Amino acid sequence: MVYAASRYVSQLTKDTLALVLAGGKGTRLKELTEHQSKPALHFGGKFRVIDFTLSNCVNSGIRQIGIATQYKSHSLLRHLSQGWSHLNRDMGEFVELLPASQQCSSRWYQGTADALFQNIEFIKEQSPKYVLVLAGDHIYKMDYADMLAQHVQSGADVTIGGIEVPVHEAANAFGVMQINKSGRVVSFDEKPDSPSPLPEDPALALASMGIYVFNTEFLLNELQKDAHSLTSEHDFGNDIVPQCIADYEVHAFRFTDSLYGLKPYWKDIGTLDAFWQANIDLIEVTPKLDIYDDSWPIWTYQKQSPPAKFVFNNDNRRGSATDSMVSGGCVISGATIDRSLLFVDVRVHSYSKITESVILPNVEIGRDVNIHRAIIAANCSVPSGMNIGFDHDEDQARGFRVSPNGIVLVTQNMLENLREQAPWEHAIQRYSQPKHLHS
């Protein structure tokens, strides 16, 4: 059956409830997620990671959204209350927070399927025809209405979003699907050691994006069965999906093109290397992820900050930035920024140089500091004269974390521990730390 696209998609999205799983610990991000969940991480200069999934929902016409939260959720809840309270409940639009242990059970969420089961009454109250299950910790732009339309027209019970990735990247990282010519999923392996390649291209595998469309009644039945299974881990990838493939119609939606015919961009920023790379991707002349596209905006909350400022123009003391993104509230005072991304309210003092680095919000960098291929966590105060990213043995000896690809993570706790280990040296650095905004 062929439908008039605009009317059909509009009705589809109105009949859909989105449930965003936003409780991930993000343990591979090490100290970056020590005090917050992965979806709450800062990204792209002014956003939070979860903003991309939520913006996709709103831009797709899906305005009924539940967010299941769990791990260290304070900063996430604060961001959602500040930035995502604009939907109109009188029009049936909402972003509902669903913390663990406050629904039909007193226990923590035991897995992705259990997160939905504990909110089963919430799902029933909304009476949607379809439930769109999403991960809140991926970076991408996607029109979910296209996936919903395919789901209905194919007659599937479940549709799984999939993207082509190199086989070596899929190994031990993603759920991998095999599909037949009609798009039906015939096998699903969760994070296999040796992923099955696509028949038409042995270098690629079809990886699950963690996006699922369910017919609501079907989902409720499967959640009930899974909840009462003594052998289940209550996880979509390990339990629900394999069982559905064996018994029901499960189809794949292949995310083969992004909006407006661009090559799809989808990133799991679950490691330090991936987090750094996804941010650095944005500074390219033509980035694979276009955050400047007014037709598909990324919505967020950001405090009011003044414009970025660059001061001093002497030969050896020039405030400048090349091939970089510098956010509001930043002051570059006689320092050089190259191929880097600076979040809001970063201050870099004279004679310092930052290259190929990601500097998170509210960071102060002293004089004569050199930083290369690093992530400087929020609220750091980097003392004058420090070099980061040039000698990894020295970086590790100082307590900084070095990733497999050589990205150095620095947090304020690491800097404070270093100061305690060498109090005389750091007393001198504190004494020489700039006292003025423009120094």
UniProtKB/Swiss-Prot annotation:
GO BP term, pick one: glycogen biosynthetic process
Statement: the UniProt record of this protein carries the keyword ATP-binding: yes
Coiled coil: none
Keywords: ATP-binding, Carbohydrate metabolism, Glycogen biosynthesis, Glycogen metabolism, Nucleotide-binding, Nucleotidyltransferase, Transferase
Short name of one Pfam family: NTP_transferase
Enzyme Commission number(s): 2.7.7.27
Gene3D superfamilies: Hexapeptide repeat proteins (2.160.10.10), Spore Coat Polysaccharide Biosynthesis Protein SpsA, Chain A (3.90.550.10)
Reactions accelerated catalytically: alpha-D-glucose 1-phosphate + ATP + H(+) = ADP-alpha-D-glucose + diphosphate
UniProt xrefs under InterPro entries: ADP-Glc_PPase, ADP_Glu_pyroP_CS, GlgC_bac, GlmU/GlgC-like_hexapep, NTP_transferase_dom, Nucleotide-diphossugar_trans, Trimer_LpxA-like_sf
Domain of life (superkingdom): Bacteria
Record-level Gene Ontology MF annotations: ATP binding; glucose-1-phosphate adenylyltransferase activity
NCBIfam families the record matches: glgC (TIGR02091), PRK00725.1 (NF001947), PRK00844.1 (NF002023)
Similarity field: Belongs to the bacterial/plant glucose-1-phosphate adenylyltransferase family.
Subunit structure: Homotetramer.
Function: Involved in the biosynthesis of ADP-glucose, a building block required for the elongation reactions to produce glycogen. Catalyzes the reaction between ATP and alpha-D-glucose 1-phosphate (G1P) to produce pyrophosphate and ADP-Glc.
UniProt name for this protein: Glucose-1-phosphate adenylyltransferase 1
Provenance organism: Pseudoalteromonas atlantica (strain T6c / ATCC BAA-1087)
